[in-house]
Amino acid sequence: MVSRAKVGAETTKGIDEPDRNDNTDDNGAGAVEVTEAAEDAVELTNDISTQLPQHGFLARFYTGLSRLYTGTGVFEVVGRRRLWYSVGGVIVAVAVLSIIVRGFTFGIDFKGGTTVSMPVSPGVGGTGAIEVAQVADVFKKTLGSDPESVVVVGNGASATVRISSKTLSNDQTSKLRNALFDAFGPKGADAKPSKQAISDAAVSETWGGQITKKVVIALVVFLVLVGLYITVRYERYMAISALTTMCFDLTVTAGVYSLVGFEVTPATVIGLLTILGFSLYDTVIVFDKVEENTHGFQHTTRRTFAEQANLAINQTFMRSINTSLISVLPVLALMVVAVWLLGVGTLKDLALVQLVGIIVGTYSSIFFATPLLVTLRERTELVRTHTRRVVKRRTLGSQVGKKNADSHVAAGTRKPQNQAESCADASSQEGTEVATASVPTVLSKLAPGVRPVRPTGTRRPTGKRNNVGRR
C-alpha cells in the first residue's frame, strides 16, 4: 500500500512539474505586456461585439443609442476627421460663395427708408391675406413703383399692415396716406375712419450702421476674452480650436441668411452674439471631458491622445444633443409667438438667427472643434512620441499573446503522451502491478475495484495539519 501511494505521488509530481515550468518560462519574459494586452483584448472584444449585426437595423440602432446615453458608445469621430473636415469645408465654401454672389437682404434699419403703417381693415376679412396684395397695388398706382415689403404685423384686432420702401419725400408720403385712406378707410381708436390711424416714419441708414459698429466691437472683445480664458483654463490649442469653431459658426450662419434670403436686421446682428455664446458653451463641455480623459496621458500606454479625445466625444455626445434640443424648444416657442400671435418682426428675427446658430453650433462642437484640437496636438512631439509608444506596446502585446496561445495549444496536444510515458516509466521501475494501480491515480477515472490514494502531505487542503501517526 505504501509503495502504491509513493509511486502515485511520484507519478503525479512527474506529470505536473513540466506544466509549471512551461508556464513559468512563458510568463516570465513579458508579464506586464501580457497583462496589458489582455486588458486591450477584452476592451477590443467589447467594442467589436457592439459592432456586430444584432437582429436587424433597429436592434443595432437601439444598442448604439443606449451606449451613447451611457457614455460607452463607439461612434468614431476623431478617426474620421478628414470626412468631417471635407463636409465642413463644403459648407463654408457654399456659404462664402453665397455671400459673395447673392449678398445680404438688409432691412430698412441698415439701408434707410420710410415705413407706413395702418390697421388691418375688417371689411377685407381682417386676416390681412388680401390686404397685402391690395396695399401693394395702391402703393404702385400712387407712386409708380413697387414697395420693398408689405407685411402684416400682429394678429386679430391689433393687426397692422406695415409698408417699407425707399426714402420718400413729404409730398410722396402725404399722397400715399391719402390713397390708403380712400382705399381702405382705416379706423382710429374711436372706431371711426381717420387719417390719423395711418402713421409713417423715416429711418436713417446711419442708425443701422451704428448698431453694426457696436456689435462688431462687442464681438472682437468677446473673442479676445474667450481666447484668454480658454488659454488660462485649458491650453492654447483648445483656445485656437474654440476660436476657429466660432468663426465657422459665424460664417455658416451668415451664409444661410444670404442663401435663403432672410432679412438682416439689428436683431439678427445682436443674435449672432447669442449663438456664439451657445457654441462656446457646447464646445467647452466637450473640451472639459477631453482634459479629464487626457490628464497625464503620457504616463500610460492604454490609449492614444486621439482615442481619449474620441472617448470624450462619445461620453458627451448625448449631453450636447439634449442641450441643443432643450435650447431649441424656447426658440421655437418664441418664433410661434412672434409670427402667429404677436407678429413682432424683431422677435422673429432674433429667434430665427438663434435657431440657425444652435443647429450649426451643435454640429461644430462635435464634428469640428475636438477633431481640430486632435490635429493640432498631434503635431507636438509629446503626442507623437506617446502614439509611437502605444503602437509599439500593442504590437509587442499581440506577439506575446500569440506566442502564449501557440504554446498552450502545443501543450494540450502533448499532455496525453506525457501521461502515457510517465505511466510507462513508473511501471518499469516498480513493476507491472504497481504501475497498473498508479495510472488510475493520475487519470480522473479510476479502474473498478481500485481504492483512491490518500494524500501523503503533512497539510490538509484546508491548511490544517494532519495528526501524523494517528489512525
UniProtKB/Swiss-Prot annotation:
Biased composition (Basic and acidic residues): 13-23
Residue ranges crossing the lipid bilayer per the database entry: 88-108, 211-231, 242-262, 267-287, 325-345, 355-375
UniProt-annotated stretches for the region Disordered: 1-29, 393-471
Composition bias type Low complexity, residue spans: 448-460
Coiled-coil ranges (or none): none
Signal peptide: none
Endoplasmic reticulum in keyword set: no
Intracellular or extracellular location(s): Cell membrane
Ranges of biased composition (kind: Polar residues): 415-431
Function: Part of the Sec protein translocase complex. Interacts with the SecYEG preprotein conducting channel. SecDF uses the proton motive force (PMF) to complete protein translocation after the ATP-dependent function of SecA.
Record-given protein name: Protein translocase subunit SecF
Source organism of the structure: Mycobacterium leprae (strain TN)
